[in-house]
Amino acid sequence: MNTEATHDQNEAQTTGVRLRNAREQLGLSQQAVAERLCLKVSTVRDIEEDKAPSDLASTFLRGYIRSYARLVHVPEEELLPGLEKQAPLRAAKVAPMQSFSLGKRRKKRDGWLMSFTWLVLFVVVGLTGAWWWQNHKAQQEEITTMADQSTAELNADKDSGQNVPLDTRDATSQDTTPAQTAPAPATPVDSTAATQTPAATATATQNTVVAPSQANVDTAATSAAPAATETPSALPTSQAGVAAPAADPNALVMNFTADCWLEVTDATGKKLFSGMQRKDGNLNLTGQAPYKLKIGAPAAVQIQYQGKPVDLSRFIRTNQVARLTLNAEPTPAQ
């Protein structure tokens, strides 16, 4: 009867009461139990008062109670029913991993943004390349067209230039015929001079064939042959005056370091030159300023105007057809 009464009494006592009674029987204080179990005094007090701290997990609380029971020699099996009531096991709540899905969604968005950026970059590069190619092709077509036009003009100039010596030769023969058929004077000195006149006439005729532009000068010299018979020293003087003309201050001098097409027009609209110049070639032009120039390859030509070099660097940098006008500078009065 006493055993059953003791068992019923133990069941009536809670876990905290039984642990406190066992501690008091052993003469231990709460401080001593806390030091041996490495717990806080407040935790030991909560266990004896059957309190479950809110900041303490049930798993840890059950472990502390078992350690306390072993310390005060209380069987753990007797405390199990009370443990289920005092510290029931609670299922742990698992929070959804929102950060992972958020990071994945953000990474996907960044991938789309990067793809769009690369697409825009490729489009810009493609448009730039197409624009450059169109400009380059247009320049090449323009140069080809100008070269074809200059070739046609050169052929026309050659055809007209071949007819000039024939007309000049006829005019020269007409002018020299009276000089050859003129009656010879009676004096021996005059006959000697008349004998030299046909030779000078023949020489003038040969010069007109070689240089058509001097036909008028040679014709005038031939028509003046009777006057030369009277004063033989006058002929060399007049020839020297024709051979050494005065230098034109508006002369245009060009030296070519590579093949280059160009067109030069003076103020009257006359084309002084239009065509292709080869490497190491030189070109001296004289006309009425200002000059208008079109140069296919500015880097291949060096220009001097009025003794000063012409700056073509702005055309060389852009690698375009040079179009410029050279204005005449006033010369100082002498």
UniProtKB/Swiss-Prot annotation:
SUPFAM superfamilies per the UniProt record, alphabetical: lambda repressor-like DNA-binding domains
Example GO molecular function: DNA binding
Main location, first listed in the record: membrane
Gene3D superfamilies: lambda repressor-like DNA-binding domains (1.10.260.40)
Sequence ranges of Low complexity compositional bias: 176-207
Region (Disordered) residue spans: 155-207, 221-241
Database matches in SMART domains: HTH_XRE (SM00530)
Periplasmic topological intervals: 133-334
Functional description taken from the UniProt entry: Cytoskeletal protein that is involved in cell-shape control through regulation of the length of the long axis.
Protein name (record): Cytoskeleton protein RodZ
Organism in which the protein naturally occurs: Salmonella schwarzengrund (strain CVM19633)
Lineage: Bacteria, Pseudomonadati, Pseudomonadota, Gammaproteobacteria, Enterobacterales
Protein encoded by which gene: rodZ
